[in-house]
């Protein structure tokens, strides 16, 4: 058995193998983080070895909490594990649910706690090559335009976040300021 994540089975939250949750499309908990510096968002391109959505661009980091782990602890852990980022403490922004086919017979059926981390000052990013093949900073509206033009290059969840939840994730300050 692999990593156990919190998933709902028969309306009860129980530990379930992460791969099984995706194969069966079970509703499960997830965590997503966006790191923002001024008007730019740090995005990552998922490693080619990932079992779903390899090579696609996603938000700064995303994962599933371990069975006994809080969402905020998970957010900090995954910033460190995926990107080598330490000393950044994301703030909780929003809980959302989505359902998306992610290829290879896998389904994301997630209840996601979304966090926003404001980067002030230098940030050392050292991507874990097992998780991330590339990173870049991109302006909010440039990201929207790129997703519109090349949707096949982005994960389903990033497109859902940007198109349906941007106001609650980023707040009006980033969205309005980015237009100026």
Swiss-Prot record:
Can you tell me which residues bind Mg(2+)?
62, 82
UniProt cross-references to InterPro entries, sorted A to Z: Idi_bact, IsopentenylPP_isomerase_typ1, NUDIX_hydrolase-like_dom_sf, NUDIX_hydrolase_dom
Q: Decide whether keyword Manganese is in the record.
A: yes
- The source's domain of life comes to Bacteria
List of catalytic residues: 62, 110
Q: How is the cofactor bound?
A: Binds 1 Mg(2+) ion per subunit. The magnesium ion binds only when substrate is bound. Binds 1 Mn(2+) ion per subunit.
Q: Could you name the Gene Ontology cellular component terms for this entry?
A: cytoplasm
Hey, which pathway is this one from?
Answer: Isoprenoid biosynthesis; dimethylallyl diphosphate biosynthesis; dimethylallyl diphosphate from isopentenyl diphosphate: step 1/1
Q: Where does Mn(2+) bind?
A: 22, 28, 64, 108, 110
Q: Extract one GO molecular function annotation from the record.
A: metal ion binding
Q: What is its main location?
A: cytoplasm
Q: Which portions of this protein are annotated as coiled-coil regions?
A: none
Catalysis: reaction(s) = isopentenyl diphosphate = dimethylallyl diphosphate
Its localization reads: Cytoplasm
GO annotation terms (biological process): dimethylallyl diphosphate biosynthetic process; isopentenyl diphosphate biosynthetic process
In this chain the Nudix hydrolase domain maps to 26-160
Q: What cofactors are annotated for this protein?
A: Mg(2+); Mn(2+)
Q: What is its EC number?
A: 5.3.3.2
Report if keyword RNA-binding is assigned.
no
- Keyword line: Cytoplasm, Isomerase, Isoprene biosynthesis, Magnesium, Manganese, Metal-binding
Q: Which Pfam families match?
A: NUDIX
What does this protein do, in the record's words?
Catalyzes the 1,3-allylic rearrangement of the homoallylic substrate isopentenyl (IPP) to its highly electrophilic allylic isomer, dimethylallyl diphosphate (DMAPP).
What protein family does this chain belong to?
Belongs to the IPP isomerase type 1 family.
Record's protein name: Isopentenyl-diphosphate Delta-isomerase
Q: Which organism is it from?
A: Ruegeria pomeroyi (strain ATCC 700808 / DSM 15171 / DSS-3) (Silicibacter pomeroyi)
